[in-house]
A protein has these predicted regions:
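Glycine/aspartate-rich loop-and-adjacent alpha/beta segment that forms the canonical ThDP
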Residues: 216, 220-281
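Structural motif
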Residues: 26-34
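Cofactor-binding active-site loop characterized by glycine-rich and histidine/acidic residues
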Residues: 18-21, 33-166
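Short secondary-structure boundary/capping segments
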Residues: 82, 190, 252-256
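Thiamine diphosphate
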Residues: 110-112, 116-119, 124-230
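Glycine-rich beta-alpha junction loops
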Residues: 70-71, 179-180, 241-245
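N-terminal capping segment at the start of a domain
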Residues: 11-27, 177-179
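Non-catalytic, mobile gating and regulatory segments of ester bond hydrolases
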Residues: 1-6
Length: 281
């Protein structure tokens, strides 16, 4: 395991990146991005086996798909700080002709992006296809995908969940960001998802529940435990409980910050709560 203090410093810096990116263009999705900072840092800095520079085909390395593409700020921040592209490019988030669009696309050729993810509900299907490709090519590495809990209200996911288990896709780790919030309210209010653990089990998946998805040590442990479950004829899912807006007190645990930007005073407040650690872009 990497040095947890160093990883936590990166998480804090990523939070700063998210706030500054969204504030500059007065547009974006800070809540879910902040809630998944620990996950992205854990995955890219500690868990995944990746090659640099970026290779689109992902042969003989772990690969990652972001399905809930609206949380692109956290994805872009971690990719840039991991060295996929220059950190200064974060300044272009959501600008015309930028490679860093509000929802990731492949058209711009941004390193780290393997599939467009503007429309919810498609990432799991794509990741299953990639997992099958690795099996056919005798590639032993792992495919990771992140989904939102509200995104599971899209029916395509359940076809994919059924297919993955029926076809023994056991080189796949899906993580669901369970923050209980979406654009119009709580997931219980909008379209209750029921007992996700029992649903995945009934579909034939290996299920892990991560109670502390904003604790970087626990995230790493859970991802490594998921890896230990691979190769046993079942796909693996982590139900990762997070807090929307984590790390910024006035954004925490409310759907109101799903898709709005902080104003000047709110930005100042949020940055004060997350002091610069490894350098602003």
């Amino acid at each position: 395991m990497s040095n947890i203090r160093e990883l936590q410093d990166i998480v804090i810096q990523v939070r700063r990146d998210i706030l500054r990116m969204v504030h500059k263009v007065n547009s974006g999705h800070p809540g879910g991005s902040l809630g998944c900072a620990e996950f992205f840092v854990s995955l890219f800095y500690d868990v995944m086996e990746i090659k640099m520079p970026f290779e689109m085909n992902g042969i003989n390395q772990d690969i990652f798909f972001l399905s809930n593409g609206h949380i692109s700020p956290v994805f872009y921040s971690v990719l840039s700080r991991k060295g996929y592209f220059p950190i200064k490019e974060l300044e272009t988030f959501r600008l015309i002709n930028s490679r860093l669009q509000g929802h990731p696309t492949t058209h711009e050729g941004l390193p780290g992006i393997r599939v467009a993810s503007g429309s919810l509900g498609q990432g799991l299907s794509v990741s299953i296809g990639s997992s099958i490709s690795k099996k056919l090519n005798k590639d032993s590495k792992t495919v990771y995908v992140l989904l939102g809990d509200g995104e599971l209200q899209e029916g395509q996911n359940w076809e994919a969940i059924m297919f993955a288990a029926a076809n023994n896709i056991d080189n796949l780790i899906a993580t669901v960001d369970v923050n209980g919030k979406q654009i119009d309210g709580t997931t219980d209010e909008v379209l209750n998802l029921g007992n996700l653990k029992m649903k995945f089990i009934s579909f034939g998946w290996e299920v892990l529940v991560l109670e502390k998805g904003n604790n970087i040590s626990e995230v790493i442990k859970s991802l490594n435990k998921a890896k230990s479950k691979l190769g046993k004829s079942k796909p693996v899912v982590i139900l990762m409980k997070t807090e929307m807006g984590n790390g910024v007190d006035f954004m925490m645990n409310t759907h109101a910050w799903h898709g709005i930007a902080p104003n000047d005073e709110q930005l100042k407040n949020g940055l004060k709560q997350n002091p610069e650690t490894i350098g602003d872009y």
